């Protein structure tokens, strides 16, 4: 029988509640599928049970202490093996979530997870953000991305997906302030503003800084540009 994770106290300590039995069962099944399929798809270098639950599952949820996502239409950009999108769907089943990634193997994996966990109102798409954003312009209430790209790059890739007054949530590491400094005021060009910054101390899985933006106006037609051009002009040093 598969070993079941039992250190649910880390969720209570960091989120203020213990997951329901249904959520626990789905997370345990998700972990089992992740480890099994990782042998084929090379999804994550982190496979130890304790580490996956803390560094992937819990980390995917910490931002929810700062904003509500209930009943929101969400896009997870560069979702990889489903962080944070699958985790959010398990905890907040009433959300409507689209997962996108340019790696088709990861999309295949996500479809396995969605089917086995019987998740509803969630879709995995093999797509590039800069191309899909032109098609799905101003469609989402929330766009979210976890450790995908340098700040000015992900801002440009994500902003067109959002409705006006929609939220962009970026789950970052300890260098977020440096990325803001080097972003060349791209947020002003994109008509989006930083409204909140959540700083999380290192409690065993690294210092985290989560950034919250709000879209003020429609995205100028220029953006997003081709990916190569975005990266070439990035403020990353």
UniProtKB/Swiss-Prot annotation:
Keyword line: Cytoplasm, Methyltransferase, rRNA processing, S-adenosyl-L-methionine, Transferase
Keyword Methyltransferase on entry: yes
Annotated positions binding S-adenosyl-L-methionine: 78, 83, 129-130, 146
Example of a GO cellular component annotation carried by this entry: cytosol
Domain of life: Bacteria
Alphabetical list of SUPFAM superfamilies matching this protein: S-adenosyl-L-methionine-dependent methyltransferases
Top-rank EC class of the record's enzyme: transferase
EC number: 2.1.1.-
Pfam families reported for this sequence: GidB
Compartment annotation: Cytoplasm
Recorded GO MF terms: rRNA (guanine-N7-)-methyltransferase activity
Summary of the function given for this chain in its UniProt record: Specifically methylates the N7 position of a guanine in 16S rRNA.
Membership in a protein family: Belongs to the methyltransferase superfamily. RNA methyltransferase RsmG family.
Protein's UniProt name: Ribosomal RNA small subunit methyltransferase G
Protein's organism: Mesoplasma florum (strain ATCC 33453 / NBRC 100688 / NCTC 11704 / L1) (Acholeplasma florum)
